[in-house]
């Protein structure tokens, strides 16, 4: 009798490999917990329309790579090829967006019918983050910083962060016309794949791996040149915030994402540890997706990384340490601190201090909404955080923050609520005070 084998591109994880995966998952969970994210789990199987509407029918994912079938109820069903559309669908279906901004993370298998190779399988595992309802450039930097800090903590070597702005839909339509006209004049130099994409999804030609196409595109107009003044100003704010966080980055005007829902900030984190520069993590802003799926216009930003490629990088760097990772975990999901902030200078200072306090081990939730202080305090109360750190422009100017105890403060030993100023440059002292 013929021995049964797993399907091509569907790989077993044996116990030794599983232990390594669990170590990575534990570190990721710890980072997400400290950033105030909540886990969400969605079905592997969705109606095909979700991905056709969300990802875009002209994309390679929808056109070539999805596992789709008609079930016994005569419905077209698809094994999820990515996680974002499912998370947004769940948030809409259960009315979560009516409760204010939502911060989710997820992990699980995805499915795409593509040629299997090292670090790429037909069933692959992704871990991702989705921030729904927050539209500030500062939140872009915060979410990118979360990905960067996680990969650095895991020990991935040779990391490079590349960023670009895809602008608004109007910006991209303007650029699409310019790019198509430029490529039409050089159609004889295009390969077959690029010719197919020229009128269906021309921006994806910018992501071509064909050496001749990459060389041809060196002289092509860039999307950045087509951006509006407002889009350029927004992108500049993201760069300033990344610099404030001391996260190195490179501008890549050719960087595009493979899914239609992206706009404004897009990014990829790559590593050269496997020889060629390989993408470890990618994502960006997708403000139009919620509306495309039937909701109200809602800003959103997210990213995901593939576990298979990440594990290859960790093996190459010999940097996986399960016992060290597991030792840092703590059971509680209650934030230690909720950062309330308002004002241009205060928001940037708050972004930096939240990043520093998370690095020091605190569970910190940063309010990036720019809402009035009273609304932020209501959210702080709902978060069940022990403390609130309040930073306005006046406090930021003085390098101070007001620390408020949010739990029951009136006791015999302490009859009045704790409300004190603290130097923001004294991170160690702030951590000690919060942990008292």
UniProtKB/Swiss-Prot annotation:
Keyword ATP-binding applies: yes
Enzyme Commission numbers on file: 6.1.1.21
Pfam families in the cross-refs: HGTP_anticodon, tRNA-synt_His
Xref: InterPro entries: aa-tRNA-synth_II (IPR006195), aa-tRNA-synth_II/BPL/LPL (IPR045864), Anticodon-bd (IPR004154), Anticodon-bd_dom_sf (IPR036621), His-tRNA-ligase (IPR015807), HisRS-like_core (IPR041715), HisRS/HisZ (IPR004516)
GO CC, any one term: cytoplasm
Signal peptide: none
SUPFAM superfamilies reported for this sequence: Class II aaRS ABD-related, Class II aaRS and biotin synthetases
UniProt keywords, alphabetically: Aminoacyl-tRNA synthetase, ATP-binding, Cytoplasm, Ligase, Nucleotide-binding, Protein biosynthesis
Main localization of the protein described in the UniProt heading: cytoplasm
PANTHER family noted in UniProt: HISTIDINE--TRNA LIGASE, MITOCHONDRIAL-RELATED, HISTIDYL-TRNA SYNTHETASE
Family: Belongs to the class-II aminoacyl-tRNA synthetase family.
Assembly and binders: Homodimer.
HAMAP family recorded: His_tRNA_synth
Record-given protein name: Histidine--tRNA ligase
